[in-house]
Design a protein with these regions (language model features):
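Active-site pocket-lining/capping segments in soluble small-molecule metabolic enzymes
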Residues: 1-168
Length: 168
């Protein structure tokens, strides 16, 4: 799967469309879409729903299933007991759902660089850290014209393998 950018500002939308056209016959399994605009860019191609679609309920899951997504990632904010109720179907067949089991969740996307007071973009290695008043360190990663600020505490659901009603 090729992951598409969660946000596309300005020329990045055209660049993303160009890259999709260049890779659609390259043997990849499809595209992970994280933005509703990706549905149009990938129309007719194999798509799976990623984190950026914010799937937290059956209405959203059903909408994306009807748009042709072959599987969907449910946000970790959904209670374990509610995951089973998010069960989309398309043409009478269930659409697989999944959850993130481990990782640092993105908290915020920003176009302005929060690290700019430390160094300019020309001297940046595209990684950094913001420290809050409680000394928590929030990783910052830059790319494709945006900066992503991550939660310093990773989610972990590896201790619930049988309790999660998902396919992956």
């Amino acid at each position: 799967l090729l992951e598409l950018p969660r946000v596309m500002f300005g020329a990045l939308e055209q660049d993303t469309a160009r890259r999709i056209a260049a890779t659609q016959d390259a043997g990849f399994a499809g595209y992970e879409v994280s933005n509703i605009a990706h549905l149009r860019l990938c129309r007719g191609l194999s798509m799976t729903g990623g984190f950026g679609l914010n799937i937290t309920n059956n209405v959203a899951a059903q909408f994306y299933a009807e748009q042709g997504l072959s599987s969907l990632l449910i946000l970790p904010e959904v209670k374990d007991s509610d995951i089973a109720s998010i069960a989309p179907a398309c043409n009478g067949k269930p659409v697989p759902t999944g959850v993130m089991i481990y990782g640092h969740m993105p908290l915020m996307l920003t176009r302005a660089c929060p690290l700019q007071n430390i160094h300019d973009c020309a001297h940046c290695d595209k990684t950094g850290v913001l420290t809050d008043r409680k000394a928590k360190k929030f990783p910052v990663r830059c790319g494709l014209g945006v900066r992503t600020i991550y939660n310093p505490v990773p989610i972990y659901m590896g201790d619930k393998p049988g309790a999660l009603a998902v396919d992956y």
